[in-house]
């Protein structure tokens, strides 16, 4: 006979599964059509090569150059 703890554990497992599935859907979205930085169109070739692209090549290069100093190495 299930008790309250079993019921709550089942609810938590279902909630976790829904959250994981929602996160997977967010990361598998289509590429943006325009760059989030400069609003220039993102070429179809870039969107095909990098499906989750949100920046044009130029803006992505600048973004990576700025952020490479903040990466931590293990």
Swiss-Prot record:
It comes from Escherichia phage P2. This is Uncharacterized 8.2 kDa protein in gpA 5'region. GO terms for biological process: positive regulation of secondary metabolite biosynthetic process. A zinc finger (dksA C4-type) spans 35-59. The keyword Metal-binding applies. InterPro entries: Znf_C4-type_bac, Znf_C4_TraR, Znf_DskA_TraR, Znf_DskA_TraR_CS. Pfam families: zf-dskA_traR. It comes from the Viruses. Keywords: Metal-binding, Zinc, Zinc-finger. One of its GO terms (molecular function) is zinc ion binding.
